[in-house]
């Protein structure tokens, strides 16, 4: 909803509602994941070293997701400009156009590998599919309207799967 509002597809008067939908969506994701993990954990008979490794990987992907969504973009440079919003093509956003999808998927994959369970697997698959559909909408509809240079960014940076060149650019821009 927020992206549709920013792309001027929805009226700005709906801003309060878009914030509400974000909070509701976040809470649904959090609660459904917690319930699925709790159910899967109930059937565990013992804990292994491998599960500990998978849990650490879950935490790593979760931290990458949080960093990418909330800290990787410089707010002023990305959102507060005189001549429209510009894309940011350094760090994580040199890797691919939607790096959060990689970390979100990795987080759910390793969470499922840690605890197992059909419910958690189904939830992970649904959430990852919905996340993918969301970034397809962003990439094709909303971001080209929000970011004045998005089509140029699309030519330089891969959609989801990093390339050798984009990995090198990510590392290079992080060093600077």
Predicted regions: what is each one?
Residues 1-89, 103-176:
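Membrane-anchoring alpha-helices and their flanking helix-loop junctions
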Residues 91-94, 98-101:
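Glycine-rich acyl-CoA binding loop
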């Amino acid at each position: 909803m927020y992206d549709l509002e920013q792309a001027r597809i929805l009226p700005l008067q709906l801003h309060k509602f878009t914030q509400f939908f974000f909070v509701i969506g976040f809470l649904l994701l959090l609660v459904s994941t917690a319930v699925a993990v709790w159910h899967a954990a109930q059937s565990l008979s013992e804990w292994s070293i491998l599960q500990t490794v998978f849990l650490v990987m879950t935490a790593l992907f979760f931290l990458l997701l949080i960093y990418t969504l909330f800290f990787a973009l410089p707010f002023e440079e990305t959102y507060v400009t005189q001549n429209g919003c510009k894309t940011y093509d350094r760090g994580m956003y040199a890797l691919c156009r939607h790096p959060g999808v990689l970390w979100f998927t990795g987080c759910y994959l390793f969470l499922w590998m840690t605890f197992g369970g059909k419910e958690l697997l189904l939830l992970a698959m649904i959430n990852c599919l919905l996340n993918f559909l969301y970034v397809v909408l962003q990439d094709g509809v909303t971001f080209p309207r929000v970011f004045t240079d998005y089509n140029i960014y699309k030519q330089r940076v891969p959609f989801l799967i990093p390339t050798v060149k984009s990995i090198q650019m990510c590392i290079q821009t992080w060093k600077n």
